[in-house]
Amino acid sequence: MPILQRASHHELRSAFRALLASERCYHTASVFDPMSARIAADLDFEVGILGGSVASLQVLGAPDFALITLSEFVEQAARIGRVARLPVIADADHGYGNALNVMRTVVELERAGVAALTIEDTLLPAQFGRKSTDLISIEEGVGKILAALEARVDPELSIIARTHAGVLEVDEVIRRTRAYEAAGADGICLVGVKDFAHLEQIAAGLKVPLMLVTYGNPELRDNQRLARLGVRIVVNGHAAYFAAIKATYDCLREQRGAQPCDLNATELTHKYTMPEDYILWAKEFMEVRE
């Protein structure tokens, strides 16, 4: 397909559902603007993802503390949606509020052209006196998934329920994933899976496709084994975005006649977003516990 030729949003959603229905495991391209989306499609990636953390960096220059608003996130998704030739998953965080806010989130992101979106059960934004890793109840999580399904117009839009396997006992992860599957989620997204033994416990009995956020975990690199366990989508992280930060810094530094710098992309991101300040403010003003 020529670079400037676009597919319809419905066609891209159908293409994403075909990935979920396949027996393969696909790795996402991190897309954060129209250019990165075009590059990913031209390099024959089957699917892209707009991460909430990356959107916060790109739009606000801020770390991932649930600071970006729905309208800001949707605007960035729409810019990508105008040119996308591959299905794009939107990391919709907690749906930007309660179940009614989730409905609004689905309406806006569907209109922006995303092929799928994830709704997570993390308690966001961080609440006064609570742990930053706290989750909402299963009942509230189910309500959000039901609300998302009610709000979508195009039945090809995939609603994926996301939970954090790294902060819960495995029995609780199983309860949550089963509940979200029963509510009608088109897929389950898991964060924090430690290894294949952990994944096998969670995946046993699940019929919906799985999406895995691994951040490059070396314990989860066997694509064929992942596929056999029902994993269809893997998010390794957002290396392309951080490489762009590093390249920009190095290029501008060279233009100023400075010597090469040995700061890596992670260190540069910390330097210019100052996450330590946000952590300090959360503790000082909200008594948030890590």
UniProtKB/Swiss-Prot annotation:
GO molecular-function term, one example from the UniProt record: methylisocitrate lyase activity
UniProt: Mg(2+) binding residues: D91
Annotated binding of substrate, by residue: S53, R162, H238
An individual GO BP term: propionate catabolic process, 2-methylcitrate cycle
Class of the enzyme per the UniProt entry, highest EC level: lyase
Catalytic activity: oxaloacetate + H(+) = pyruvate + CO2
SUPFAM superfamilies: Phosphoenolpyruvate/pyruvate domain (SSF51621)
EC number: 4.1.1.112
Cofactor binding, note field: Binds 1 Mg(2+) ion per subunit.
Record keywords: Decarboxylase, Lyase, Magnesium, Metal-binding
Cofactor dependency: Mg(2+)
Subunit structure: Homotetramer; dimer of dimers.
Similarity section: Belongs to the isocitrate lyase/PEP mutase superfamily. Oxaloacetate decarboxylase family.
Function in brief: Catalyzes the decarboxylation of oxaloacetate into pyruvate. Seems to play a role in maintaining cellular concentrations of bicarbonate and pyruvate.
Protein name according to UniProt: Oxaloacetate decarboxylase
Source organism (scientific name): Ectopseudomonas mendocina (strain ymp)
